[in-house]
Amino acid sequence: MALKRLKTKKSKRLTGRLKHKIEKKVRDHNKKERRAAKKNPKKGSKKQKLIQIPNICPFKDDILKEVEEAKQRQEAERLARREAFKAEREQNKFKTLESMVEDADMRSTVHGIMHENDAQDQDEKKYKNAVTKEQSLKQYFKEFRKVIENADVVLEVVDARDPLGTRCNEVERAVRGAPGNKRLVLVLNKADLVPRENLNNWIKYFRRSGPVTAFKASTQDQANRLGRRKLREMKTEKAMQGSVCIGAELLMSMLGNYCRNKGIKTSIRVGVVGIPNVGKSSIINSLTRGRSCMVGSTPGVTKSMQEVELDSKIKLIDCPGIVFTSGGENSHAVLKNAQRVGDVKDPFTIAESVLKRASKEYFCTMYDITNYDTFEEFFAKKAARMGKFLKKGVPDVVAAARSVLNDWNTGKIKYCTQPPEVQEGQSVHISASIVHSEAREFDVENFESMETEILEHCAVKTDDIMEITSTGPLEIRQPREEAEPADKITASLVIDEKEKPAKGRKRKLDEEKEKVDPSLLLEENQSLNKGIKQMQKLKKKQNVRNEKKISKITDVLDSFSLGPSSSKAEKYDFDEDYVIE
C-alpha cells in the first residue's frame, strides 16, 4: 500500500486564490518585458526586408543595373579612403624632425593670431587696474594726511609680535614735523599673543623714545556692550586669552591725564594710524564698547577717515591702513598681513620662508602630519589633511600654502621678536627733554610700576612660541615725482613694479571726459568684469561713430574746391557739372 501511494501523482488542482495570483504575476511580468523592449529595442535583430521590383515594371533591368553600379561606386570609395589613410599613416611614420618643427611653428602662428585680441584685452585690463590702484594709493595718503592735520594726539598701532617690523619712523617724523604741538603714543596691540616677559622688554625699549602702552582689542561679535577688563584683573593666562578687551582703562586714563595736564577744557582729537589689519578699528570699537567702525580679517576694510566720539573730552579718528615699503618685494607685506593672501600669485616662496623659521617637528605637531623631507611634500600632506583635492585626487598644494600664510597672520603660528640690545650711553634720535615732557603730560610714571608688577606675575609657556628676527622698521619708498608729495607714502594696496601706471593724464574737455561708475572702483564689487565689458562696448561704438563722421568730412573736403574747375566755372551747367555717383 505504501508503494502504491508513492507512485500516485500529485494533483494539479489549485485553489482559486493561488491560481489568480499566479496569473496576475505572469501578466505583470509580460507587461514589464514589453515595456523594457519598447525602451531598448534590439538593433539588427530583424533582417532588412529586401526591396523587390515587380516583374511588370518595364524598366526592371535598368533599375537593377543602376543599383549594382551604385554599390560598386560605394565600395570603390571605401577602398580609396582606406588606401589614403594607409598612405598618410606610412608618411607620418617616417616624419623628420624638421617637418615637426615647421608644423609646430605653423600651429603656434595660428594660435597667436587667434588669441591676439585676448592678449590686448588683458594688457588693457592690467593698465586700468594699475591706474585704479594708483588713484587709491593717493586717496589713502590724503586721508592719512588729514588725520595727522586734524589730530592732537596720534596713536600709532603696532603688532606686539613684531613691533619694529610693523612700525615706521616716517609716521613719527610726520607727527613731529606737523604744525601744532602734536603728541605720539605707541600702542602694542595683540598683547595676548606674546609672552609677558617679551612684552615687558618691548615696553621698556620703547619708553626710551616716548609714551607706550600694551593693549588687547576685543574680539567679541555683538554690536554693543563689548567686554572690558582692567589691568589689575589680568593675573592669569586664561584672562589674557579671552575675547574681552584689556588695556582700555589705562589708555583712556593716559588721554584723560593729557587733557588735564595741558589744561584743555574743550575736547581733543585722537588719530589712530598704522599698517593695514594691525587692529586700528578694533581698538576704537573696544574703547567705545560698540561697533563704531567696520572691522575684518583682510586688509583694506577702512576706506576713508572716520570720526567717532568717545566722550565729551575725546574724539577718535580712524585712518585707512598705510604701508611704507622700500622695494617691489611684497613678501614682508604679506607676512605682516598688509596685503591680502588671496592676491599673492606665488604663495609657495613666502610659505617656505615661514617653514624655514622653525623646526620640522614644530609644524608636524601643529598640523598633525608625519615627517617630511621637502616643502612640496609638506604642502601635499597638509592639503590631504585639510581635505583639499583637485581633479583625479591631486592634493591642492596652493590652498595648503595659502593656509600656512593665513595661520601666520591670524596667530595660529605663534611667534615673537626680541628688542634690540641697547648699550649704555647709546643716543636716541629724540632728545631726553622731549621724552620727559611727554611722559609728564600723559603721567606715564604712575602706570609704569603697575604694568611691570602685573606683567611679572603673569607667566606664560613659551614652548610653542618661536622667536624670529625682526625685519626692522619700514622705510619710505623713493618718490616717483618730486613735485608730488602724495607719492612718498603708499597705501594698503601695493602695486607690482612690472605694471607701470600712467604718469599723467591729458586734459580733456568736460564733454569728452569718460564718466566711470564709482561702484566699479570698489574691490568688493562682484560684477566688475561685466561693467568693464559694458564700458568697452560703449567705447567701441563711440569710436565707430567718430570714424564715420571723420570719413564724411574727408569726402566733403576732397570734393570741395575753392578754384574754378574749368573754363566754364562762371556758368553752371546742370547736365555737365552734376554727376550722380
Curated annotation (Swiss-Prot):
<dbReference type="GO" id="GO:0042127">
    <property type="term" value="P:regulation of cell population proliferation"/>
</dbReference>
<dbReference type="GO" id="GO:0005730">
    <property type="term" value="C:nucleolus"/>
</dbReference>
<dbReference type="GO" id="GO:0001652">
    <property type="term" value="C:granular component"/>
</dbReference>
<keyword id="KW-0175">Coiled coil</keyword>
<dbReference type="InterPro" id="IPR006073">
    <property type="entry name" value="GTP-bd"/>
</dbReference>
<dbReference type="GO" id="GO:0016887">
    <property type="term" value="F:ATP hydrolysis activity"/>
</dbReference>
<dbReference type="InterPro" id="IPR014813">
    <property type="entry name" value="Gnl3_N_dom"/>
</dbReference>
<dbReference type="InterPro" id="IPR027417">
    <property type="entry name" value="P-loop_NTPase"/>
</dbReference>
<feature type="binding site">
    <location>
        <begin position="189"/>
        <end position="192"/>
    </location>
    <ligand>
        <name>GTP</name>
    </ligand>
</feature>
<keyword id="KW-0597">Phosphoprotein</keyword>
<feature type="compositionally biased region" description="Basic residues">
    <location>
        <begin position="1"/>
        <end position="49"/>
    </location>
</feature>
<feature type="modified residue" description="Phosphoserine">
    <location>
        <position position="99"/>
    </location>
</feature>
<comment type="similarity">
    <text>Belongs to the TRAFAC class YlqF/YawG GTPase family.</text>
</comment>
<dbReference type="Pfam" id="PF01926">
    <property type="entry name" value="MMR_HSR1"/>
</dbReference>
<feature type="region of interest" description="Disordered">
    <location>
        <begin position="500"/>
        <end position="519"/>
    </location>
</feature>
<feature type="compositionally biased region" description="Basic and acidic residues">
    <location>
        <begin position="500"/>
        <end position="517"/>
    </location>
</feature>
<dbReference type="InterPro" id="IPR050755">
    <property type="entry name" value="TRAFAC_YlqF/YawG_RiboMat"/>
</dbReference>
<feature type="domain" description="CP-type G">
    <location>
        <begin position="141"/>
        <end position="325"/>
    </location>
</feature>
<keyword id="KW-0547">Nucleotide-binding</keyword>
<keyword id="KW-0342">GTP-binding</keyword>
<keyword id="KW-0539">Nucleus</keyword>
<dbReference type="GO" id="GO:0042273">
    <property type="term" value="P:ribosomal large subunit biogenesis"/>
</dbReference>
<protein>
    <recommendedName>
        <fullName>Guanine nucleotide-binding protein-like 3 homolog</fullName>
    </recommendedName>
</protein>
<feature type="region of interest" description="Disordered">
    <location>
        <begin position="1"/>
        <end position="50"/>
    </location>
</feature>
<dbReference type="InterPro" id="IPR023179">
    <property type="entry name" value="GTP-bd_ortho_bundle_sf"/>
</dbReference>
<dbReference type="GO" id="GO:0005525">
    <property type="term" value="F:GTP binding"/>
</dbReference>
<dbReference type="Pfam" id="PF08701">
    <property type="entry name" value="GN3L_Grn1"/>
</dbReference>
<dbReference type="GO" id="GO:0003924">
    <property type="term" value="F:GTPase activity"/>
</dbReference>
<feature type="binding site">
    <location>
        <begin position="318"/>
        <end position="321"/>
    </location>
    <ligand>
        <name>GTP</name>
    </ligand>
</feature>
<feature type="coiled-coil region">
    <location>
        <begin position="64"/>
        <end position="108"/>
    </location>
</feature>
<comment type="function">
    <text>May play a role in regulating cellular proliferation.</text>
</comment>
<dbReference type="InterPro" id="IPR030378">
    <property type="entry name" value="G_CP_dom"/>
</dbReference>
<dbReference type="GO" id="GO:0040014">
    <property type="term" value="P:regulation of multicellular organism growth"/>
</dbReference>
<feature type="binding site">
    <location>
        <begin position="274"/>
        <end position="281"/>
    </location>
    <ligand>
        <name>GTP</name>
    </ligand>
</feature>
